[in-house]
Amino acid sequence: ERVVRDNFWNSSSNITGIRQDSISRSYAEAYGSYEKGGFRDTWQAVKGWSAGAVTASIRHLEKISLKGSFAFDQTEGYGMCGSMFIDPGFYPVDILEFTPGRKTLQTYSFDGGISYDISEDWRIGASMDFESANMSKRKDLRHSNWKLDMTIAPGVMYHRGDLALGASYIFRKTAESIKAEQVGTAESSYYAFLDKGLMYGVYSVWSGSGLHLSEAGVNIFPVKDFSNGAALQMQYKGLFAEVEYLRTQGTVGEKEYIWFLFPGNEVNAIAGYKIRGKHHTHYARLGIGWESLMMDESILEKVTENGVTNVFNHGSNRILANESISVSPEYEAAGRILEIRAGAVLKWKESLSSQMYPYADYQSLMNWKAYA
């Protein structure tokens, strides 16, 4: 970890920067954990365990550098209900169910990257990060989830002396599908809640059309998000900076059944300064982020003629608007034996939800944490 953190380019989207360092390292780890307690979120397990393995490597050759890692994790949680998503809060919509049960989550991830010197002053490279996860709940209301998170980022760098300039393109796709089912023979159906923002939405029988968990033509709840953007990097001696912009376009539904659309914009900036002393190396880092996201609900009409059902889209209503700003300063001092790190994360978020005109609900949050 110290080798990775020593090179500021490793935290950027431009893989060509790994050649700004010449240290080759490999790493492997196996881990396990057990958790139990009542101080937890609504969707977290009453008790649970996880185990997994991680391996990573960076290799530098004469004109080429390679970077890669692989990880696997399995988590078992007991007494779980609430959000049906693998990563609650990642998307602006959520679905909640209320019967505690056991959940199993398996996560596979790998990343790879290559950087190549095409001339004395120019480098090119590309990287890919891939993560796949599946989760299942074994008690009604049962559900199975499949999640994908993939990022591809080609980059280029010009470097001469103490100066290095870089640029990279970023493409990211995330997707998750939820398939719900009721196997048991309960006297009544189970209920679920579709959260459309700030805990306003639809509460009904899980198979009702308002929840979209079980609809004619679509038997899953699919969410997709595509992001395209670019980043610029600069390094001069111990100073490093990067600015990144992403334009996102997300949908809930598939084919003609697009129930929600959530476009957004994201800007992130990071800066770092390194001073290498005789016995210690000092690092100062600063991250700043801004994100804006809107969500529109489609107005769909189903018309059946002669046994054929057609779906007509009559436009959409804006039902949610989110905007957030985050700041994260950090200081680190690393020596041969001792390492000290301290920092803070501050985040401001404003949300406006309006399910039905002219009624609206506004929320303003400020979160912070400090660590050492």
Ranges and model annotations:
Residues E1-Y78, Y91:
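N-terminal, post-signal peptide beta-strand-biased segments of exported outer-membrane/organellar beta-barrel
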Residues S26-Y34, G68-Q74, A126-S132, A167-K173, ...:
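Transmembrane beta-barrel strands of outer-membrane/channel proteins
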Residues G38-A45, G79-F85, M135-H143, I178-G184, ...:
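Outer-membrane beta-barrel translocator domains and adjoining extracellular loop/strand segments
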Residues R40-V46, E97-K103, K139-H143, G217-V223, ...:
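Outer-membrane beta-barrel domain signature
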Residues K47-A53, T104-F110, S144-I152, K224-A230, ...:
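Residues that define the transmembrane beta-barrel architecture of outer-membrane proteins
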Residues T55-R59, F110-Y116, I152-Y158, A230-Y236, ...:
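Residues on the lipid-exposed face of transmembrane beta-strands in outer-membrane beta-barrel proteins
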Residues L61-I64, S119-D121, H159-G161, K237-L239, ...:
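Outer-membrane beta-barrel channels and translocator barrels
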Residues C81-D94, R138, F171-K224, Q249-W259, ...:
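Short, flexible helix-coil linker/hinge segments at the edges of structured domains or between repeats
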